[in-house]
Amino acid sequence: MSVRYPLLNRELGILGFNERVLAQAADPQVPLLERLRFICITSSNLDEFFEVRMAGLQEQIRDNPGALTPDGMSLQHAYDLVVERAQRLVHRQYTMLHETVLPALEQEGIYFHAADTWNDEQLEWARRYFLDELLPVLTPIGLDPAHPFPRVLNKSLNFVVELEGRDAFGRQAVMGIVQAPRALPRVVRMPQALSGFEHGFVLLSTFMQRFVGELFPQLVVKSCNQFRITRNSELFVDEDEITNLRVALQGELPARHLGNAVRLEVSADTPAHIVRRLLEESLLDEKDCYRVAGSVNLVRLMQIPDLVDRPDLKFAPFTASIPPVIANAPAMFDAIDDGDILLHHPYESFQPVLELLQQAAKDPSVVAIKQTIYRTGTDSPLMDALMAAARNGKEVTVVVELLARFDEETNINWASQLEAVGAHVVYGVVGHKCHAKMMLIVRRVVEGGKATLRRYVHLGTGNYHPRTARLYTDFGLMTADQKICEDVHHVFQQLTGIGGELTLHELWQSPFTLHPRIIESIRAEIDNARAGKRARVVAKMNALLEPTVIAALYEASQAGVKVDLIVRGVCALKPGVPGLSENITVRSIVGRFLEHHRIYYFHADGAEEVYLSSADWMDRNLFRRVEVAFPIRERKLKRRVIAEGLSVCLGDNQSAWLMQSDGHYRRRRAGKTLRNAQLGLLAKFCS
């Protein structure tokens, strides 16, 4: 593709975001156990990065090696740059863990016991634990012509054991593989009386390396090293050929664990000839091998903060508030009848959203409920309420997105449970993921002595997921505005039925009007700037990649429009380039909570148009998904969105990172007054 305007590389941008996440682990202002958690989050993010983005790059290189990336690099050059940066990031991650975080944890009485530090009593306890709890579950595989190298599961923990001697059949033993079943605990607590520390732990890998000889009796163990293979986890479902998406997906899910290898992780002391064998068996190159000083899966350390009762080493707990208009109302419908309600999570509770649905399930006046589900978790009170509504005779329709990445199995299970109680379940539109967050409740009310149907709607920027609603920043709107409700009704009709494109009056919807409306709104600011009027665009999102939107923003900058972008993750736009984007700033907020809301602000000659949305400015959101953006019209709520969603981020000088024109980020230096967006909102709303 020819690049008219400069773009930054997507994969490098994703790694840049993870560098900012990892920087939280180095921040002494962050509580110690939370610093460990940020290291684990970085590992989890990198796993998905390799499963999806790096796997995609490898496939493109194989299929079309001469192609260019959207930013104009050759695929191979881009891949080499990404690998180099990923290797540096992983090295920094493990260095931070071993040189900073683990020593600090030890000072606080939280210790990971290595086998070479065990005394006799600890050794005996560890031996008994291995023999009683681990050995019965483990299956050693000796490698010979009758036992080929196993195809290890995606991201599973494995041990390669170098052996010497002959087995019971007289075969020369050379190498064995032991796969650790996912059911085995990766972290085991040592009894405090034995440990000598308030919280002593032993890693599964430590048990294995010390006692693996029990699995290969009468053989000499020369070495035992852990390794992990990351595989391509994209599911392939031919949506043009299938007749039942759920059945097709159920057939494809098991293959996810056995896709092509994209990364090999090995412990740093693994012998070179063993590494070569693992690479050969995985069909990987040396550059795809990541040698790590410690556990090959740091994600499993995520449980440590939950196992350690040390509130002083964690973020202070908070109680999300409930708006007085809700707390003082007899029921949720009464509160919404009094006017639109804006909820700002996690500072304001997600509970009113659940209560709206729970009350609707029991209310005899409610005749129908329609709901979209993208991610909701395995244990969801929201889904329980939908099933209760169906059992109570309500007309319940749920649009379940089966292709929500890594939540496919959960959503299949929910779809089955919903159908079992009589709910109508549809899977959206083939070829377009349904990412919109919508709830529609139809209620029979009496107005002026006459029975009529009244609609109530909840629209959000984030998922209907109670757990992540305490971890992600999102806005939600509850309204009975009949224009918005009518639009939501039409979108649901479109998702569940078959028909032509609908005319919506208030909502912007992808893949139809969302992208054109964004471009039109930016161009209106350009026209105002050229006419000598004040012009401004402020947008907050997770990612900015779509080339035509970026081109429009460049043109806006050249016309004199002030553009402030708050992009948490990857941003392909280059800010601050003279003659191109000197009027554009890009910042990323990384803190306790995951910044997740999407906000579009256009000055509009003083009218100040504000839209909330589930959509980032990416190709997939604007063209290959069903998304909605909804306006905030009520003046007080609009001021809140601007103040709480945009202004606090633009003023943040503690957790903000400013993007430079070369794509790198630097922390915004604190001024005389320290301003932290998330801490300020916690202080304002929470107790």
UniProtKB/Swiss-Prot annotation:
PANTHER family: POLYPHOSPHATE KINASE. InterPro entries: PP_kinase, PP_kinase_C_1, PP_kinase_middle, PP_kinase_middle_dom_sf, PPK_C_dom2, PPK_N_dom, PPK_N_dom_sf. It comes from Burkholderia ambifaria (strain ATCC BAA-244 / DSM 16087 / CCUG 44356 / LMG 19182 / AMMD) (Burkholderia cepacia (strain AMMD)). GO terms for biological process: polyphosphate biosynthetic process. Gene3D superfamilies: Endonuclease Chain A, Polyphosphate kinase middle domain, Polyphosphate kinase N-terminal domain. This is Polyphosphate kinase. Keywords: ATP-binding, Kinase, Magnesium, Metal-binding, Nucleotide-binding, Phosphoprotein, Transferase. An intermediate of this reaction is the autophosphorylated ppk in which a phosphate is covalently linked to a histidine residue through a N-P bond. Its cofactor is Mg(2+). Mg(2+) binds at residues 375, 405. It comes from the Bacteria. The keyword Transferase applies. Its EC number is 2.7.4.1. ATP binds at residues 45, 472, 568, 596.
